[in-house]
Amino acid sequence: MDRKNLLRRDLRHNWHPYTQMSTLATEPPTLIDRAEGLFLFDAEGNRYYDAISSWWCLVHGHGHPRIREAVTRQMERLDHVLFAGVTHEPAVRLASRLAAIAPEGLSRVFFSDNGSTAVEVALKMSLQCWRNLGREERTGFVCLDHGYHGDTTGCMSVSGVEAFLRAFRPILFPARRVPAPYCYRCPAGKTHPGCGVSCVDALGDALREGGDTVAAVILEPLLLGAGGMIAYPPEYLSRAAALAREHGAHLILDEVATGFGRTGTMFACGQAGVSPDFLCLSKGLTGGTMPLAATLTTAEVYNSFLGGPDSGKTFYHGHTYTANPVGCAAALASLDLFEEEGVVDRVARLAPRLAEGVRELAGLPLVGDVRGIGMVAALELVSDKGTKEPLPGTAPVFREIRLEGMRRGLFLRPMGNVVYLFLPQAVTREALDDILDRFGGTLRKVLR
């Protein structure tokens, strides 16, 4: 089918996510035909670096032969089977591998199919765990402004990005939100590192106010993704974990975006020496190739669900594609590549170069802040550097950046007033230098 006909049918039937569809009538979506390695290719043969890892999930590059072969073999043997009263080798092996590499104490794995469901599972497990233990008063959650945990109802209820919540307030449950550790816009009016990370005090206050009614604290460790690519110090996370423990609340860490080496360690929470009660994983779990998610938890939580058939302690939650064998096979192949190719070490080695390259753009007009961690780097654009007034996300400059990036072979998708790179862990030094050159050229031309 030719390009024009495909796009015409797309606009007739498809409803794209996070998209004002009326704009596509004059500026249709990019028709991607194939992908290979670090690149996307459109239907006209143009090549683009996948500079946002296809929404933050790509790890080893597109079409890695090892993952492709693992998926093909599994499809030929067992494509899918329910996971209630049934098990299979890929799920058993993957659960064992995840428990082996996870932070200490996380020995139980519940599979689902995307990041939102991984978080939803953690929220429900925390609530029911307390109920099973006779602590039914613990029903509340503490979360962060600018935090984002997914688009299902529970996830939205503990998120703090207003654009995603505004239309759905009537169906959300209340949660205690505290200011984010947002160094550029410090809620305490201080400057890191001399601040003593005093912004965490608000979290302590919320836990004291909530008392025995708080079920869990939920955080994205070290990087608030959809809230603006806000990187924050490991000290905040370690103190937040200590506060949750002090007040007897569970700690849920959402590593859907940060897991699997993205920040320079296998899991971001490792940089703070933190082991949560629940760890939520997806995106990079399969190397970014197949829908799969996992919620890891402790033996203590797991044991609270054990009882007789009539005990009321069973966890009544599941998904059709729970532990899909093909997804598990992809994840196992991805984990093999981590071990064989030194993926995490490569990220740690190249992260300073990414940070250095983006810092060179700090002096450009409208650039208020430059931040990042690991393979993530972001620029926050402001209309006034003195007042830090955010540039509206609807400002024409963001469209210009996206289009200029594509002209230079970079696939970018600015988010609000933030322009960012979220690079695959497979990036080489040569490719990184090329990406930075194209990214810098894009910003300098548009913001000059």
Residue ranges and their predicted role:
Residues M1-R448:
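Conserved N-terminal phosphate-binding loop of PLP-dependent enzymes in the Aspartate aminotransferase
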